[in-house]
């Protein structure tokens, strides 16, 4: 791991040093550093340890009246002293993860222009498309290794949030550091401001983004190409993560660029990887194979279809043919089961459509296509996954029907935020007599049922993407492939308390997430080497590289460097 014992030579001093979040120590500057860096009189006289600072800021955090207030407060610490911010998260990750990311970050995105305090990251707007190289050069960090970028068109389940979507890259990169040990000095959040179709934002006098309807079509594609080209010129080896792009753009962008640069779409690939890791863990715990499952999805967008394709790939690794695997996956959208006769399906949806002959007779009543209950009933479903963004779609009747086919069904309502969840864990467990295995997209409290406490696994992408990023950075992989993602899923499954015999939760507790990220990083890096996408080394060398790149929040001694 990155140590804090070696001194760091810097040329900043006085107020400018205190204004640099990556370097500021606040009250922890030593007496000698205060003299050497002209800080005498700029800070209270008492010198504190980072532990004492954490105690103070945590006390202030607890005084915040609402979750949004807590989010704003944590962001203010991050913008003042990044080391202290991440040390605080390290001490209270369980408590603060829902504050810095889902579900609270959704409200922060909606209120972005109202709660804006200071700059962080880059805002690249369409009217300034001829100056993207200049904008990237203005980034104060030179050694960027991971970028998270959004165009804000599909922020969580909240839709188009304009530049307010910047909260997502900031939050995601905070998790890269807190969970995966990526130094904040190597991360950069970016929002692509291509306008907004959110009328409420366009009419809001406080909205800070470009007041224009969204650019689309060739203009949009050309703008993205300009951005990608500029990023490759500035940081040719960077990992670029696409985040919260609309369904119509997310998959095409990933398909276009995944073989040209090291890129990754967390909504599609990260969600798929953690979902498959969860499903693999449940199968291992039940002594079943993935190929024995019948999986029903509610929601057939890019995220749901991405999970489905990842499951199919995992089934094929187990020995099923592609056609056999596809017959075990059922995608239901607002019109019903995706079938060959359904019009207006996108290419990635067509690949998952069932043959009409195979589902003949499944439709009840006058519906043209089989509905969710029909599908669960006739398919003999054992797994139910929700990525619809619609509250309450997993009704009691649907869940009880699922329970008829499987003594321990896996139910995964993954929609965010909490207000959009398809069913709550309490409901699911009540309807299955406490026998369902439950993993959710948002955090939920443990459920008391039948005299026992059931801990609810949060099927959160933070279990996956930080480890993938750490592995890519450690081995310097040039691409991210499906096999690397599958390696991540398998590594996550092996960490499940149900598999290791250390508990009844499907996924490990968040307090273990840094160790989980290390294991995922090793699996990803080994697969990258096996595919010839990284320089081949020994496992010992990989482990050393992972530890060398794992940053821990602690203050280093500073020495003055002459300009």
From Swiss-Prot:
Substrates-to-products reaction catalysed: (S)-malate + NAD(+) = pyruvate + CO2 + NADH; oxaloacetate + H(+) = pyruvate + CO2
Needed cofactors: Mg(2+); Mn(2+)
Binding residue positions for NAD(+): 154, 267, 416
GO cellular component: cytosol
CDD domains (UniProt xref): NAD_bind_1_malic_enz
Annotated site, Important for activity, chain positions: 267
EC number: 1.1.1.38
Family: Belongs to the malic enzymes family.
UniProt gene name: maeA
MF GO annotations: malate dehydrogenase (decarboxylating) (NAD+) activity; metal ion binding; NAD binding; oxaloacetate decarboxylase activity
Species of the source: Pseudomonas syringae pv. tomato (strain ATCC BAA-871 / DC3000)
HAMAP family, sorted: NAD_malic_enz
Entry keyword annotation includes Phosphoprotein: no
Keyword Calcium listed: no
Entry binding sites for a divalent metal cation: 243-244, 267
Residues annotated as the enzyme's active site: 101 (proton donor), 172 (proton acceptor)
Pfam hit, one: malic
Keywords, in A-Z order: Metal-binding, NAD, Oxidoreductase
Disulfide pairings: none
Subunit structure: Homotetramer.
A single BP term in Gene Ontology: malate metabolic process
Cofactor binding mode and count: Divalent metal cations. Prefers magnesium or manganese.
Record's protein name: NAD-dependent malic enzyme
């Amino acid at each position: 791991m990155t140590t804090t014992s070696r001194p760091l030579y810097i040329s900043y001093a006085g107020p400018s040093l205190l204004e640099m979040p990556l370097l500021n120590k606040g009250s922890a500057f030593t007496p000698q550093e205060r003299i050497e860096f002209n800080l005498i009189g700029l800070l209270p006289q008492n010198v504190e340890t980072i532990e004492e600072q954490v105690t103070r800021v945590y006390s202030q955090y607890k005084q915040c009246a609402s979750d949004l207030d807590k989010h704003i407060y944590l962001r203010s610490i991050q913008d003042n002293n990044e080391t202290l911010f991440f040390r605080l998260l390290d001490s209270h990750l369980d408590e603060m993860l829902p504050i810095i990311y889902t579900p609270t970050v959704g409200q922060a995105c909606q209120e972005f222009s109202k709660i804006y305090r200071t700059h962080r990251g880059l805002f690249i707007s369409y009217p300034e498309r001829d100056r993207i190289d200049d904008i990237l050069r203005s980034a104060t960090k030179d050694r960027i290794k991971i970028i998270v970028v959004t165009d804000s068109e599909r922020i969580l389940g909240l839709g188009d949030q304009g530049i307010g979507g910047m909260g997502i890259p900031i939050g995601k990169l905070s998790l890269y550091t807190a969970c995966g040990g990526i130094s904040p000095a190597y991360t950069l959040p970016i929002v692509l401001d291509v306008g907004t179709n959110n009328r409420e934002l366009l009419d809001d006098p406080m909205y800070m983004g470009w007041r224009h309807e969204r650019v689309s079509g060739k203009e949009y594609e050309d703008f993205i190409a300009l951005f990608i080209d500029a990023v490759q010129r500035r940081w040719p080896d960077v990992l670029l993560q696409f985040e919260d792009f609309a369904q119509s753009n997310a998959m095409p962008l990933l398909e276009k660029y995944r073989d040209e640069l090291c890129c990754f779409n967390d909504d599609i690939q990260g969600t798929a990887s953690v979902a498959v890791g969860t499903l693999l863990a449940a199968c291992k715990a039940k002594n079943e194979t993935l190929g024995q499952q019948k999986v029903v999805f509610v929601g057939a967008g890019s995220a749901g279809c991405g999970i489905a394709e990842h499951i199919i790939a995992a089934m094929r690794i187990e020995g099923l043919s592609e056609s056999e695997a596809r017959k075990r996956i059922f995608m239901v959208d607002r019109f019903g089961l995706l079938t060959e006769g359904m019009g207006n399906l996108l290419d990635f949806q067509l690949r998952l459509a069932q043959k009409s002959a195979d589902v003949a007779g499944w439709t009840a009543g006058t519906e043209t296509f089989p509905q969710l209950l029909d599908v669960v009933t006739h398919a003999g479903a054992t797994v139910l996954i929700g990525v619809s963004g619609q509250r309450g779609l997993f009704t009691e009747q649907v869940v009880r029907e699922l329970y008829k086919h499987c003594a321990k069904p896996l139910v995964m309502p993954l929609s965010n935020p909490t207000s959009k969840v398809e069913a709550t864990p309490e409901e699911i467990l009540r309807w299955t007599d406490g026998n369902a295995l439950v993993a959710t997209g948002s955090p939920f409290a443990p459920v008391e049922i039948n005299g026992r406490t059931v801990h609810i696994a949060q099927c959160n992408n933070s279990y996956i993407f930080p480890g993938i990023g750490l592995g890519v950075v450690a081995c310097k992989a040039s691409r991210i492939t499906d096999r690397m993602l599958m390696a991540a899923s398998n590594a996550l499954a092996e960490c499940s308390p149900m598999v290791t015999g250390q508990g009844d939760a499907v996924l490990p507790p968040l307090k273990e997430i840094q160790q989980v990220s290390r294991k995922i990083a090793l699996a990803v890096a080994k697969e990258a080497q096996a595919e010839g996408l990284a320089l081949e080394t020994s496992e010992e060398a990989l482990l050393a590289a992972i530890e060398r790149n794992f940053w821990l929040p602690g203050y280093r001694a500073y020495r003055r460097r002459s300009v």
